Curated annotation (Swiss-Prot):
Gene (name only): engB
Entry annotated with the keyword Transport: no
UniProt function note: Necessary for normal cell division and for the maintenance of normal septation.
Family: Belongs to the TRAFAC class TrmE-Era-EngA-EngB-Septin-like GTPase superfamily. EngB GTPase family.
UniProt cofactor(s): Mg(2+)
GO CC terms in record: cytosol
Binding positions for Mg(2+) per the UniProt entry: S45, T66
Gene3D superfamilies: P-loop containing nucleotide triphosphate hydrolases (3.40.50.300)
PROSITE patterns in alphabetical order: G_ENGB (PS51706)
Name this protein carries in UniProt: Probable GTP-binding protein EngB
Organism domain of life: Bacteria
Keyword Amino-acid biosynthesis: no
Signal peptide bounds: none
CDD domains xrefs: YihA_EngB
Amino acid sequence: MSFKNPVLGLCQQAAFMLSAARVDQCPADDGLEVAFAGRSNAGKSSALNTLTHANLARTSKTPGRTQLLNFFRLDDRRRLVDLPGYGYAKVPIPLKQHWQHHLEAYLGSRRSLAGVVLLMDIRHPLTDFDRMMLDWAGASGMPMHILLTKADKLAFGAAKNALLKVRREIHKGWGEGMSVQLFSAPKRQGVEEAHDVLARWLGLAGDDGGEADAGA
């Protein structure tokens, strides 16, 4: 793991760019961007806020802006993207289908997408949505890093066992190319490890003289 991650400074200056309801409303498809995906209430907004040291993403349990693709600028060539939360129980089925359509359009067409961070609640990992995302990443060759969020909700031993179980299942079903780690926003657990992955995907891993550790 790097001693001083070059992505940290960029994350600390992250700023909201725009929200897009459709792919044609997204920023110009150049540079590099990393997308954050996960079921509603998997802790995606809290993770983004923790990684950027800012209150970028709304943490309300109501859908709100989660129906949009929200872009955050790191610098002129790098962005983070908060993808629509999936599976919110109170959202009408037609709206869910609308979200899914535009999520698939974004994932299938975005050339600047360098990797996807998939967030899973450690107490309920590998849902149908998670498996769908893993299938897509495996088929497309897209780098994917999994954050097992809310790790503080389990005892240390139970969290480690959950990590090993999920890692084994992912490597068995989708290959060795996907990395998995524990993450807790309130405890700031796993922040440096996640920053190392972002640094590599955003072309910053060599800036401090060392290769980032993906935590696989």
